[in-house]
Amino acid sequence: MVLASIFAWLCMSAHADLSFDGQNRFVMKGKRLPITLVNEGKEPALAEISLDWGTDGTGQALPFAVSRPLLRLGAGQRAKVEVLYQGQGLPTDRETYLLLSVLDVPHATGKGDALQIALRHRFKLFYRPSLKATVEQAMAGLTWFYDPEGSPRTRNPSPY
């Protein structure tokens, strides 16, 4: 019980200095997606930005690049990073689910006995190609039904 209390106390004092301008997911509708990173801490921070397939992966290389995969942010500083799509390699008839990963490495304090924890932020990123159907057409195509347990379900045949 004492060990659990100590661990809970340590976890409460940890916080992330990087924020993402209030975003918790991103939708990419073109070939570029600007992302704003903000260091809200009082010390510089290092951010490592990468992308990965959102599902279990296809074994293929991602057709994306990050403009600044490693970035140093001073205290209170804002910076823009762009996710760039090369224009081919993804389905054009539906959304693609990706994961945007940002590793927040804190500044070394210089104090002898200090525990520094790097935090990894993972965000959903949806690549949405320009689709021929409208959102209204997609909504009209939804079918609603109850499953055998009595829970309401919907079937969505549209690419949205």
Predicted regions and their residues:
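Beta-sheet-dominated interaction scaffolds and their linkers
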Residues: H15-V38, T134-R153
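Terminal connector regions
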Residues: Q88-K132, E136-Q137
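Buried hydrophobic-core signal for structured, non-transmembrane domains
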Residues: L33-N39, V83, L98-L103, S151-N156
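Short acidic/proline- and small/hydrophobic-mixed sequence motifs that coincide with surface turns
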Residues: K42-A47, P157-Y160
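Short beta-strand and strand-turn-strand segments in soluble, beta-rich domains
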Residues: L46-S50, G54-L70
